[in-house]
Structures are given as C-alpha cells and as structure tokens.
C-alpha cells in the first residue's frame, strides 16, 4: 500500500528522478520557461518554489543549500541576484503551468511551466496596452 506517500514516481527510480528534477529546475531558473509533460511540471513546482523562497534571504548558508540542490553555480547566482529580489514581496506561487496540447509521438499532455512576472511577460503586457 502506498498510503501517505507523496509525489509521483514517473516510472523512474529515485536517483533518476532526483537528477531529472535537478536538471529541470536548473533549466527553468536559467530560461524562465520550459516545455514538459503536465505531470513533470506539477512535480517540478515542488522543487523550484522552495529554491526561490530560499533565495529571498541572501546568505552564505542559503547559497550553499541552493548549490547542494542544483549543483550549478550559474543557477545559484541567478537565483540570489535576480529571482530572490524579484519575488521579495510575493508570498509563494512563483510558477505558472500553461497546458499546450498533446505531444506528437505518444499523445502525452504537455505544458509550459514558467516563472510568474518574468520580464518578457511584462513587456508583452505593456505592448498590448500601448496598442489599444
């Protein structure tokens, strides 16, 4: 019985899942939007949101914790220098999942997961406002 066991298995063993979400979290922080399956996007939220919350208070200890979870110095720098200050006033909910149809090969439901309030979103909204 798998009572009270949270998280999705995604047909992978635990080390594969951990490595996959570490890579996906790094990609999401680096590019601020990625395309993946809906199930992986929902699980990725559980990895990325605590990282951004950690980045809101900049300290050596928090940077080391973030590095231990991502293993990427560039990503840690972006987390603490850009994303932490950007989301300082937001109490959680840093990601958005937008469903985008089915994958061609196997009809898996796909989605974009993006960081809320990324600069491209703000520019697009301003362009729409000026066009009206």
Swiss-Prot record:
Keyword match Nucleotidyltransferase: no
Entry keywords, A to Z: Ribonucleoprotein, Ribosomal protein
GO molecular function: structural constituent of ribosome
GO terms for cellular component: cytosolic large ribosomal subunit
DNA damage recorded as keyword: no
GO BP terms: translation
Domain of life: Bacteria
PANTHER family linked to this entry: LARGE RIBOSOMAL SUBUNIT PROTEIN BL17M, RIBOSOMAL PROTEIN L17
UniProt record similarity statement: Belongs to the bacterial ribosomal protein bL17 family.
Subunit record text: Part of the 50S ribosomal subunit. Contacts protein L32.
Protein name: Large ribosomal subunit protein bL17
Gene: rplQ
